[in-house]
Amino acid sequence: MKPLFMWAGGKNKMLKKYANYLPEQFDSYIEPFLGGGAMFVWAYKKNPEATFFLNDVNEDIMRIYQSIRNDVGNFLTTLDKYQEDFLPLSKPERKKFYYALRQEHAYNYQKWTATEEAATLYFLMKTGFNGIWQINKNTNGRFGTPSGLLNQKDKVYDYDNVMEWHEALQKCTLISGDFTDCLEYAQPNSFVFLDPPYRGSFTQYGVFFDDTLQLRVIKLLNDLTSAGCHVMMSNRDVGDGFFESRQGDNDLVYFDVTYTAGRRKKNTDGTHSAKKAREILMIGEHNG
């Protein structure tokens, strides 16, 4: 099992760096900022007998997971229809297909069932640009990411992976609300992974995620740690001492990383290259 879609800020590439800090044992797993779910995949493989509580404030993203869990047959029927129409097309025709479908998703989604809407968004995410979530005035405040390379050969999505997710999600409680809503599910020996929008990235689905919200995440980490949970929070170090000054008894670990999806710096000659940055992991271990 692997993440269902590419996701800017996804944790697939960071898992090896995190390996020495992840808990060996936990009874439940809680992820308040689910996104693409790479950390959930790790947790499920680590302990499939655990219970799982997954949240994201983005209702459209959560509808994809809910549809795969509860209505995978109709989800795949809709997805397969798009795939069959899309694959025979030339690249210019695929681009036209993508933008027409994106427009339908933006303005005419009321005609679809919740599952059809979710499958449509999933298709757009699989054919859109680099796992980036954008909204703009031309898409009614809904998914507005440009098309991707559109170079799929024989399939747009991985059927077996969707079915693995269908099975795994049967063990999951899925919610879409504020990230603090997870508190009611936390128990001693829960593993909670906090992956808020990074400092310097400015937005969470078009809403400014400012330092006041970052402080709420740090408070949540401290509260959960005090309750006996294993807690980890990822973020970006922008060099102003923000996390160091609020570290308390928590551990801070630093990682040098290179961003390739949507965070490319412009060179003096006008070209673009991958942007180097420093990420942090704040770790609060329980004492039970």
Mark where each language-model region is.
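SAM cofactor-binding core of SAM-dependent methyltransferases
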Residues: 27-103, 148
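Short, structured coil segments at secondary-structure junctions
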Residues: 48, 170, 247-250
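SAM-dependent nucleic-acid methyltransferase catalytic core
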Residues: 1-17, 71-193, 197-202
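Short helix-loop-beta connector
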Residues: 22-28, 187-188
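Short, glycine/acidic-enriched loop or turn micro-motifs at the edges of active sites
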Residues: 34, 59, 181, 198, ...
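Long, positively charged, glycine-interspersed low-complexity recognition regions
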Residues: 210-288
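Glycine/threonine-rich flexible loop motifs
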Residues: 203-207
